[in-house]
Amino acid sequence: MPKANPTRKTKATRETGGRKKKDPNAPKRGLSAYMFFANDNRDKVREENPGISFGQVGKMLGEKWKSLSDKERKPYEDKAAADKKRYEDEKAAYKAGEAEEDEESS
C-alpha cells in the first residue's frame, strides 16, 4: 500500500505568509555549546585547509566536536549555559515589556 502524501502547502498559503514575521526587537536565542566551539575553531580549520568548501568545514568541525572529551567540552557547555540564562532573562524582560504595551494600548 503506498504511503499517503503529506499535506502540502498550496501556493496561496505560501503567498499569504503562513509564518509570523519575527520581531526585530526580540532577544536572540542562546547558542549551543557546539556553536561556541564552532565559532572559536572555524578560522583555524580554514587556515589548516585552504580552499575547503563551507560544507567540509562544517563536517570537520563536527568530527572535532565529537572527538572532544567531556573535560574539553566543559568550557563551551559553561558558555552555553550562561548564554541560555542571558536569553531567558532577556526574553522575560521582552515579554514583560510587551505585556505593558498591550495594557497601555487597551
Swiss-Prot record:
It comes from the Eukaryota. Residues 1-11 have a biased composition (Basic residues). Pfam families: HMG_box. It is found in: Nucleus; Chromosome. Residues 1-33, 60-106 are annotated as: Disordered. The keyword Cytoplasm does not apply. Residues 27-95 bind DNA. Residues 12-26, 61-93 have a biased composition (Basic and acidic residues). GO terms for molecular function: DNA binding. GO terms for cellular component: chromosome; nucleus. Its main location: nucleus. Keywords: Chromosome, DNA damage, DNA repair, DNA-binding, Nucleus, Transcription, Transcription regulation. GO terms for biological process: DNA repair. Weakly associates with the stable spt16-pob3 heterodimer to form the FACT complex. Belongs to the NHP6 family. DNA-binding protein that induces severe bending of DNA. Required for DNA-binding by the FACT complex, a general chromatin factor that acts to reorganize nucleosomes. The FACT complex is involved in multiple processes that require DNA as a template such as mRNA elongation, DNA replication and DNA repair. Also augments the fidelity of transcription by RNA polymerase III independently of any role in the FACT complex. This is Non-histone chromosomal protein 6. The lineage of its organism: Eukaryota, Fungi, Dikarya, Ascomycota, Pezizomycotina. The gene is nhp6.
